[in-house]
Curated annotation (Swiss-Prot):
Keywords: Chloroplast, Kinase, Plastid, Transferase, Transit peptide. This is Fructokinase-like 1, chloroplastic. Belongs to the carbohydrate kinase PfkB family. Required for proper chloroplast development, most likely through regulating plastid-encoded polymerase (PEP) dependent chloroplast transcription. Acts as a component of the transcriptionally active plastid chromosome that is required for plastid gene expression. Residues 58-67 have a biased composition (Basic residues). It comes from Arabidopsis thaliana. Interacts with CITRX/TRXz. Interacts with PTAC7. Self-interacts. Binds to FLN2. Associates with the plastid-encoded RNA polymerase (PEP) complex. One of its GO terms (biological process) is chloroplast organization. CDD domains: bac_FRK (cd01167). The keyword Repressor does not apply. Disruption phenotype: Albino seedlings leading to lethality.
């Protein structure tokens, strides 16, 4: 099975197929002592560390009786870690030897997408069919399987950029689920927090543009296991080791995943991690606009770092802000030079205009406009990083799939390597240019996973796009 692959940089792992607890043995020069496990694969098995030290030999590895989930379900209703006694008392005494690069945990759903085969197939079609590419978009002859899901894409892109990432979610125990986990293992993404569901199938999304109304339609197998991850199935070992907890707004569409998400956020804050909210707003997935704003606002107030697009920001603010940006007069309409100095050729929302969305926990807000501009806001300064225009989509050469995920992965990569970027505006802009370069390369290549760049390629493009003083 794909979930049983072991990487050499892992000392221990939690398997979803083998639910026995794993004891971590630490050697010292004076003596050998056994420590209690940090957390079992089902969330139970948390014991007192002092009692384990007095034991002369480890306990048997027999299957233990599963504890009740009354305490863990109570965690789902709590939003403040200080009010939860289990969060305050939890301490397994285990330290992680790998601190560089820090681990990033990506929480959410991983799916199999079926996209037109003319983009992803290894054997391209006849060259004469290139002239009919416009019609192939409306009526593709075949569909090919492609890994999808923003959390898994961000995890893979983060590893490509030189970081360490772990995916936390659930898949079905079928061919699709095995293939997705195997794909992440091949990309060196840790999958010890992945759960397998025997009673449901992995979600499959069939993407096709309907010629009738020109809208994107998605057919999904329900109920997928991605929407049924419970709080008792969280891997606390991964949450403790991760320095950044990343999640996407799509998990808010499932009531079960909502409670599990906020429980995971509580644990991550308890362990000192940063909360990264990647807003993804396909409105057809939501029931109503008011419910969308309400759920996003709840997750928004828990996040330390947020990434949104310009259209998503205007949706959360109000339609009046869209009209203000639309009526903005650029600098090339200025009547004299003094007006040119005070105007820009684009609209940048001021901190006063986004004041209604700001809260005390928020450290960084990034507003993307494709790869053309990245607007950033911190409690002390704000500004814009200029990139390049989005590429033109052509057959068999490039697409924009996964570009936003690459930008998010680039931001998280620099957050782990340069924590002081919150304090210096010049350092902030230099690090965000790296994220812009990652998004540009993802646009230039076909597909999401195949198009994610490496750290060296991203740095090389950054040095080509910007002058040396901006590196």
């Amino acid at each position: 099975m794909a979930s049983l692959l072991i990487f050499p940089h892992l000392h221990h792992f939690d398997s979803s197929l083998d639910r026995r607890e794993v004891l971590v043995v630490r050697h010292s020069q004076a003596s050998r002592r056994f420590l209690t496990p940090k957390a079992s694969i089902n969330g139970s098995g948390i014991t007192n560390g002092a009692a384990a030290e007095t034991t002369s030999k480890p306990s048997r590895k027999g299957r233990k009786k599963k504890q009740t989930s009354t305490v863990i379900e109570k965690d789902n209703t709590e939003t403040d870690p200080e009010l939860n006694p289990e969060l305050a008392d939890y301490d397994d005494g285990i330290e992680f030897p790998y601190d560089d690069p820090p681990l990033v945990c990506c929480f959410g759903a991983v799916q199999k997408e079926f996209v037109p085969v003319v983009r992803v197939h290894d054997n391209p079609m006849h060259p004469d069919m290139y002239s009919q590419w416009k019609m192939l978009q409306w009526d593709p002859p075949e569909f090919g399987r492609a890994p999808g899901g923003p959390p898994s894409n961000v995890a893979i892109s983060h590893v490509r950029l030189g970081g360490r990432a772990a995916f936390m979610g659930k898949v079905g125990e079928d061919d699709f689920g095995d293939e997705l986990v195997l794909m992440m293992n091949q990309e060196r993404v840790q999958t010890r927090a992945v759960k397998f569901d025997e009673n449901s199938k992995t979600a499959c999304t069939r993407v096709k543009i309907k010629f009738k109304d020109g809208k994107m339609m998605a057919e999904t197998v329900k109920e997928p296991p991605e929407d049924s991850l419970f709080a008792s199935e969280l891997n606390l070992a991964v949450l403790k080791e991760a320095r950044i907890f990343h999640f996407n707004s799509e998990v808010l569409t499932s009531p079960t995943m909502q409670s599990t998400l906020f429980t995971a956020i509580q644990w991550s804050k308890k362990f000192g991690g940063l909360i990264f909210f990647d807003l993804n707003l396909p409105l057809p997935l939501w029931r109503s606009r008011n419910e969308t704003r309400k759920l996003i606002k709840k997750a928004w107030n828990e996040a330390n770092i947020i990434e949104v697009s310009q259209q998503e920001l205007e949706f959360l603010l109000d339609e009046d802000y869209y009209e203000r940006r639309r009526n903005y007069t650029p600098q090339y309409f200025a009547e004299d030079f003094d007006q040119t100095k005070n105007r820009r050729d684009y609209y940048h929302y001021t901190p006063e205009e986004i004041k209604s969305l700001w809260h005390d926990k928020l450290k960084l807000l990034v507003v993307t406009d494709g790869t053309l501009r990245l607007h950033y806001y911190t409690p002390t300064f704000d500004g814009v990083v200029i990139g390049t225009e989005d590429v033109l989509i052509t057959p068999f050469t490039c697409d924009r799939t996964g570009s936003g995920d690459a930008v998010v992965a680039g931001i998280m990569r620099k957050l782990t390597t340069c924590p002081e970027m919150f304090e210096d505006q010049d350092v902030m802009e230099r690090q965000l240019r790296f994220a812009v370069a990652a998004g540009i390369i993802a646009q230039w290549t076909i597909g999401a996973v195949r198009g994610f760049p490496t750290e060296s390629a991203t740095q090389n493009l950054k040095e080509q796009v910007y002058v040396p003083s901006m590196w």
